[in-house]
Amino acid sequence: PFQVYRHLVGSKQIEDTLIYEEKDPTFHVSVGNSRSMQFIEIDISSTTSSETLLLKSSNPLESPAIFFPRVLNHLYSVEHDPEHNRFLIHTNWKAKNFRLMETALQKSKKRSQWQEIVPHKDSVLLQSVLSYPKNIVLMERESGLRRLRVLDAKGNFERVVSFNDPSYTAYLAANPEYTSTKFYYGYSSMRSPDSIYSVDLQSGRKRKLK
């Protein structure tokens, strides 16, 4: 995909408005809602660079705004955290294994105004991030194995989700609700078939769902 159109419900498709077109064939374009449901995200990415454009869900007729313009060899993605009036940024800027930063939307175009929450680690790959009103959930990889780490909203450590097997596969499942008190992950090993679990963000209690 390389184009994004705006469609007015009830109108003819031929009347749709082109709001973004990617000229570089090495980039892929996708569209989705932020987990807060307050923004529509247009994500543009290649193997070495990425860029996010935002539209307020309350005003989808406006033009999309660039969060931070693409730069060669800079990959990033964002998580809206309305509870703290910020965006979390999963970025490889000066961090080959990625780190977590934050900024207010009005400061997003200047990386010098981004603030670090989780620093880069040479031995740990930060793969993905989920934001919640009181917590941040990280999917990391160390020594070939993934782990799930729960932080408070300031980035202070709270807990690691424990796995019983020495070798396993774990992944974040669908977690569409920013305001949820739980998050969901998938897990499998030689002894355990692929299953989905929930984790209570306050107590850390795990529950097998299927």
Where in this protein do the model-derived segments appear?
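Peripheral, non-catalytic segments that deliver or gate enzyme domains
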Residues: 1-210
